[in-house]
């Protein structure tokens, strides 16, 4: 054997970077295996991080001392807070990124991480001893011993690119696919499937008629992702906005038979919420146009990413399509768009720790689990890396539940329900989104990260100072109070009931702001802006959070009822054959997870509750890894 590590991570994309960094932060001797070190942190598709739901994940990664938020701040060239006019629960931070700056910042961060080594090579096979993962073999003959492996293969597992009639075996354009690992996973008994995603053509921005287009600038007060970022280093750029036309749609309809999607060459399912331009024209044929965002890929790079027209049409048709779009009539295409098919593992094969049920020591994260998106991949990577390090060290696994974070919502959805199409995070997937806000990710998760040893000293210090300031502001707001008559002197119309109301109570009123309170108690005007904003959000949500706490208590009660691993569902009377098969496949760990399974009925769940209570199993008595 060449060398031994505690954890080996395969893949240098967003999931792999977070997995390797998390394992190393826990003290595990970690190797990141990638084809080429210079592609680590590459943004394979759109040059952006965050968005609705996705921005919440980035903030949670940051709260656990992950890298994506910090790196996005260093590489960001346009920052916007989406849904700014709506409530804080559904606001989503987003940043356009310079591809080169982002990848460079990620590579620098990993190079500075103690306990982490980069190994260039292609993973070929897993070494298994008595059913447990014990090492990794590369295609060049090198073998490594390890306590756990994290696979973050992205679109590389038997990847096949489609551009019209052209098919190219590749993990992404210009890079070879990974062929051996799919066979290894099948040999281990894991169920594999096939999914598809796509990317649009790239354009030479110097040939775009920007003067004819609507421009979208960044926010005047850009908000960073990371709590550690004190200043954003790069100038902000604007994006252009254009639309397809009826002429565009006519060209696409005339050439559908040449599209890989519509000619039958691709049979796998693509992401519902990121459809190709062919899909948009076919499914929404009554629309007169579809919006396209023209996103610069870098400060010193003329390449532009036309967000909204991913395609599998041939190159000549792509050029014809572009010529019909306002502002792009004379555009030069730097690289054609394409669709890519790849293998994935049914995520119901996994524990909520992201460890494979049939292969102890094997963890999966990212697109291999049927998700789409950088942020979804990175969040899974962090959790998988954390648990791989704990597995290698003989510790128990860590589960983030649906009431703790969007990471928990996503993983629970995956391992409980599986996927029929690439999974994307939305705020609507979370039952407790008033609690799971982007603004309070650190309050929800950083202390847990500290307890696990996942959070470093710099973040611990920043978090400690922030919480001390916030606690002091809350305490002061609850201490200061006023009568309705006193409030009236300051222009506040309160119910004349004689009751004194605290400053915190007053902030819960929709028309009362921190600025209003500063007119009564000037000390509120002296609060650090971030602390003041957080205080106001906390106050306005307080009554709703109290109600949601009861729902969370119910969730926790159900999650405390454990279903034994060895439970034979075929022998349980009262269950339909369909449910017996689903329960046997998923093997839910708790009553809560069983209740979220597709097809579960109240009667069947009541039967399982009775059985779980009779067995007397408690969550803390059951190993979670």
UniProtKB/Swiss-Prot annotation:
It is found in: Cytoplasm. Gene3D superfamilies: FAD/NAD(P)-binding domain (3.50.50.60), GidA associated domain, C-terminal subdomain (1.10.150.570), tRNA uridine 5-carboxymethylaminomethyl modification enzyme MnmG/GidA (1.10.10.1800). PROSITE patterns: GIDA_1 (PS01280), GIDA_2 (PS01281). Keywords: Cytoplasm, FAD, Flavoprotein, NAD, tRNA processing. FAD binds at residues 11-16. GO terms for cellular component: cytosol. The keyword NAD applies. InterPro entries: FAD/NAD-bd_sf, GIDA_C_N, MnmG, MnmG-rel, MnmG-rel_CS, MnmG_C, MnmG_C_subdom, MnmG_C_subdom_sf. GO terms for biological process: tRNA methylation; tRNA wobble uridine modification. Transmembrane segments: none annotated. Its cofactor is FAD. SMART domains: GIDA_assoc_3. NAD(+) binds at residues 270-284. Disulfide bonds: none annotated. NAD-binding protein involved in the addition of a carboxymethylaminomethyl (cmnm) group at the wobble position (U34) of certain tRNAs, forming tRNA-cmnm(5)s(2)U34. Homodimer. Heterotetramer of two MnmE and two MnmG subunits. Belongs to the MnmG family. This is tRNA uridine 5-carboxymethylaminomethyl modification enzyme MnmG. It comes from Azorhizobium caulinodans (strain ATCC 43989 / DSM 5975 / JCM 20966 / LMG 6465 / NBRC 14845 / NCIMB 13405 / ORS 571). The lineage of its organism: Bacteria, Pseudomonadati, Pseudomonadota, Alphaproteobacteria, Hyphomicrobiales.
């Amino acid at each position: 054997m060449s060398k031994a590590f505690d954890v080996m991570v395969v893949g240098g994309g967003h999931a792999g970077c977070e997995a390797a960094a998390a394992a190393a932060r826990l003290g595990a001797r970690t190797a990141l295996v990638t084809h080429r070190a210079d592609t680590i942190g590459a943004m394979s598709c759109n040059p952006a991080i965050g968005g609705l739901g996705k921005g919440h994940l980035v903030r949670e990664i940051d709260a656990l001392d992950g890298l994506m938020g910090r790196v996005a701040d260093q590489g960001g060239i346009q920052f916007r807070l989406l849904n700014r006019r709506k409530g804080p629960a559904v606001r989503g931070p987003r940043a356009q990124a310079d591809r080169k700056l982002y990848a460079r910042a990620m590579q620098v961060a990993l190079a500075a991480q103690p306990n982490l080594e980069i190994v260039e090579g292609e993973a070929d096979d897993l070494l298994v001893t008595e059913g447990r993962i014990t090492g990794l073999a590369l295609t060049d003959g090198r073998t490594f011993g390890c306590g756990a492996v994290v696979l973050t293969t992205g679109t590389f597992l038997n990847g096949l690119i489609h551009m019209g009639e052209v098919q190219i075996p590749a993990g992404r354009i210009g890079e070879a696919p990974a062929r051996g690992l799919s066979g290894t996973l099948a040999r281990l008994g894991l169920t594999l499937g096939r999914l598809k995603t796509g990317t649009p053509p790239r354009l030479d921005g110097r040939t775009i008629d920007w003067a004819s287009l609507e421009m979208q600038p960044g926010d005047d007060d850009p908000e960073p992702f990371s709590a550690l970022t004190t200043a954003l280093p790069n100038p902000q750029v604007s994006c252009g906005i254009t639309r397809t036309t009826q002429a565009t749609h006519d060209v696409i309809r005339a050439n559908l038979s040449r599209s890989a999607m519509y000619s039958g060459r691709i049979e796998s399912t693509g992401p519902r919420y990121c459809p190709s331009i062919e899909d948009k024209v076919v499914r929404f044929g009554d629309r007169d146009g579809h919006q396209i965002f023209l996103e610069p890929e870098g400060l010193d790079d003329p390449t532009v990413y036309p967000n909204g027209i991913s395609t599998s049409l041939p190159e000549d048709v792509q050029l014809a399509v572009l010529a019909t779009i306002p502002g792009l009539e004379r555009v030069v295409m730097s690289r054609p768009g394409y669709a890519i098919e790849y293998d994935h593992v049914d995520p119901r094969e996994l524990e909520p720790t992201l460890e494979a049920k049939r292969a102890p020591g094997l963890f999966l994260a990212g697109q291999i689990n049927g998700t789409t998106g950088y942020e979804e991949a990175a969040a899974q990577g962090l959790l998988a890396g954390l648990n791989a390090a704990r597995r290698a060290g003989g510790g128990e696994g860590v589960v983030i539940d649906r009431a703790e974070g969007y990471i928990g919502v996503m993983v629970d959805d995956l391992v409980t329900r599986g996927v029929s199409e690439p999974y994307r995070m939305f705020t609507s997937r979370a039952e407790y989104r008033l609690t799971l806000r982007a603004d309070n990710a650190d309050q929800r998760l950083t202390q847990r990260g500290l307890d696990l040893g996942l959070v470093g000293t710099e973040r611990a210090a920043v978090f400690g100072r922030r919480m001390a300031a916030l606690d002091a502001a809350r305490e002061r707001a609850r201490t200061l109070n006023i009568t309705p008559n006193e409030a009236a002197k300051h222009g506040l119309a309160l119910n004349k009931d004689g009751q004194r109301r605290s400053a915190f109570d007053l902030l819960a009123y929709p028309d009362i702001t921190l600025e209003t309170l500063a007119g009564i108690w000037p000390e509120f005007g002296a609060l650090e802006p971030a602390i003041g904003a957080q205080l106001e959000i906390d106050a306005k949500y307080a009554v709703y959070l109290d109600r949601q706490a009861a729902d969370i208590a119910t969730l926790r009660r159900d999650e405390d009822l454990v279903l034994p691993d060895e439970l034979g569902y075929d022998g349980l009377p009262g269950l339909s054959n369909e449910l017996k098969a689903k329960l046997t496949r998923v093997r839910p760990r708790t009553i809560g997870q069983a209740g979220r399974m597709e097809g579960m009925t109240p009667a069947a769940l009541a039967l399982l509750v009775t059985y779980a209570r009779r067995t007397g199993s408690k969550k803390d008595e059951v190993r979670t890894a």
